[in-house]
Amino acid sequence: MSSMVTLREIFDKDLEDVYYFLSKNFDPGVKLDIWHSAFNRSWMHEKPNNGFMLKENEAVVGVFCALYSQRQTRKGIQNVCNTSTWFVLDTYRSHSLELMAAMLGQKGFLFTSLSTSPNVYELHRQFGFQSYVTTLIAIPNLPKLNYFSKKLEILIDPESTSKWLDAHIKQISIDHMDIPTVQQIVFRTSNETLLVIFDIRTVRGVRTTNIFYLSNPDMFYENQYEICSYFLFHNHTLFTRIHRCSISKVPTFSFEMKRNITLFYQGDIEGLSFPEFIYSEHIFFCR
């Protein structure tokens, strides 16, 4: 590495400098409060850092950000490093791979990359990442006037929802509370419960329910008409948007919005439901 350029970890005290660097050079659309909300989540006890950065004469010239989480799996506790924004100014692009090497040099983590741009797909493969290809689909929210019935109970307040969730799902719910743009709802039948974590966004001018997580994909499929009708009448959204990998079956009348979305991981994913979009930048930044 050039003596002029230094590589070091991004600590909490650096987050604002990194934010302004990315806001100026990469994505001006992210708000500072959302940025802080993402990196100040208590998803891991004593996270090591927030990623790595390149500096020259105290100025940030490149970053590779990361969100860390500690997940309960069938095999026990799994430490996950979810890499997010990887951006280096053109003049310093020769140092980009040093950021990736530093990130992967951390021991004891499963590494995921869920918003990789196509121009760095091959670089991820060269660093030993495995790939998973999915599709983004849209489900029309069709009206069903009797969606609220004895068959399907709808719970939205935290006190009511939490008592019907098992310990694992309840922790996921807790970890994603108090995020300004994110909503949660629980659908319940006599013998099943479904937690949905989602946000509302405008896609191509159309108001849409965007689902990050389903705790019970089979239940979602079986009750899709009632659930999507609820989104239509209560959230005033015309479509529900979800990745194919998050559902068990493709609903009738759904259509593809985007194909060949490639997600990456490196490490042992056995026991972890990969891919999932919780505990990641999708919750905060990806639009």
Predicted regions located by residue number:
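A short beta-loop-alpha structural element at the N-terminal edge
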Residues: 4-18
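Glycine-rich acetyl-CoA-binding "A-motif" of GNAT/NAT acetyltransferases
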Residues: 59-62
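Acyl-donor binding region in acyl/amide transferases
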Residues: 74-137, 206-263
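Amide-forming acyltransferase catalytic core, primarily the GNAT-like/NAT-type
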Residues: 18, 22, 26-51, 55, ...
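C-terminal functional modules
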Residues: 258-287
